Curated annotation (Swiss-Prot):
Family: Belongs to the membrane fusion protein (MFP) (TC 8.A.1) family.
Gene: aaeA
Top-level taxonomic group: Bacteria
Gene3D superfamilies reported in the protein's UniProt record: 2.40.30.170, 2.40.50.100
The keyword Transport appears for this protein: yes
Bilayer-crossing regions: 11-31
Membrane topology: Single-pass membrane protein
One of the GO BP terms on file: transmembrane transport
Record's subcellular location: Cell inner membrane
Cited NCBIfam families: PRK10559.1, RND_mfp
Cellular component terms (Gene Ontology): plasma membrane
InterPro entries found in the cross-reference section: CusB-like_dom_1, CusB_D23, MFP_Efflux_Pump, PHBA_efflux_pump_AaeA, RND_pump_MFP
Protein name, UniProt field: p-hydroxybenzoic acid efflux pump subunit AaeA
GO molecular function: transmembrane transporter activity
Length: 311
């Protein structure tokens, strides 16, 4: 084979390799830009901070950390005898003022029947004033009794919804103050995704669009629907000085970092069964109005789907 032919073959191979490289780079670029996506997404759920409405010693904590509880199930009980005694005293006051009010009512009615022929107007008015005072005291006693009854009811703290007890940090015998968070309850069937997408990718994101969610380290692909896009994020480049004037950070004009915007994605109901703890990471791809058919993807596309998980 002549030297000229070898040169032709070498040039042809080089051109072929370059063309294949360009095609591969174009396909990878198209894959990464055809759908808005991010690796910065978090599983999130509705979390209820459980705190008692009364103070006292904890006498019962019948649940364990990370336990699934039903709505209305007892989480913990605060020492009740003190609140039972307060209710008993309040009920005794109500009974006393009810008896006294009935007596003053009879006396006032009797004086009104006798009239000014037998009694002075001052005595009649005095009986009416005493009755009003006793009725006012009775109303206050009833309010105190109702509050004491409410306090007694709230010594038993129940789960407001079905969910998982998380970060249980109290035990029987401890004293707990009113309003102090004792445990967090992660509500069941409330899991959703917060995907932090760059502002340059928001053009392809709309409420109602479908999304693919791949938990970090998992081969399972979950599906969801875009619920909403955050209406605002913090402007980290601007702040106020001690006099209230705007302070703008210096910025290099040729370096413009895209701001990330939270996008809320609701998981499909059939995917709520897969338990990925709130706060864990996932990769999210917005596929548009419809889901993608995984059976139509080429092996190369499937490989790039997997590589996207790692960047």
């Amino acid at each position: 084979m002549s030297t000229f032919s070898l040169k032709i073959i070498r040039v042809g191979i080089t051109v072929l390799v370059v063309v294949l490289a360009v095609i591969a780079i174009f396909n990878v670029w198209a894959f990464y830009t055809e759908s808005p996506w991010t690796r910065d997404a978090k599983f999130t759920a509705d979390v209820v901070a459980i705190a008692p409405d009364v103070s006292g010693l904890l006498t019962e904590v019948p649940v364990k950390d990370n336990q699934l509880v039903q709505k209305g199930q007892i989480l913990f009980v605060i020492d009740q005898p003190r609140y039972q005694q307060a209710l008993a005293e309040a009920e005794a006051d109500v009974a006393y003022y009810q008896t006294l009010a009935a007596e003053k009512q009879r006396e006032s009615s009797r004086r009104h029947r006798l009239g000014i022929q037998a009694l002075s107007q001052e005595e009649i008015d005095q009986a009416s004033n005493v009755l009003q005072t006793v009725q006012h005291q009775l109303a206050k006693a009833i309010a105190v009794r109702d509050l004491a009854r409410l306090d007694l009811e709230r010594t038993t703290v129940r789960a407001p919804a079905e969910g998982w007890v998380t970060n249980l940090n109290v035990h029987a015998g401890e004293f707990i103050n009113r309003g102090a968070t004792a445990v967090a309850l992660v509500k069941k069937d409330t899991f959703y995704i917060l995907a932090y997408l760059e502002e340059t990718k928001l053009e392809g994101v709309k409420p109602g669009y479908r999304a693919e969610i791949t938990p970090l380290g998992s081969n399972r692909i979950l599906h969801g629907t875009v619920d909403s896009i955050s209406a605002g994020v913090t402007n980290s480049s601007s702040s106020a000085d001690s006099k209230g004037l705007a302070t703008i950070d210096n910025n290099l004009e040729w370096v413009r970092l895209a701001q990330r915007v939270p996008v809320k994605i609701h998981l499909d109901s059939e995917d709520q069964q897969y338990l990925y703890p709130a706060g864990t990471t996932a990769t999210v791809v917005i596929t548009g109005p419809n889901d993608r058919d995984p059976h139509q993807a080429s092996p190369m596309t499937k490989l790039m789907h997997r590589l996207r998980e790692f960047g």
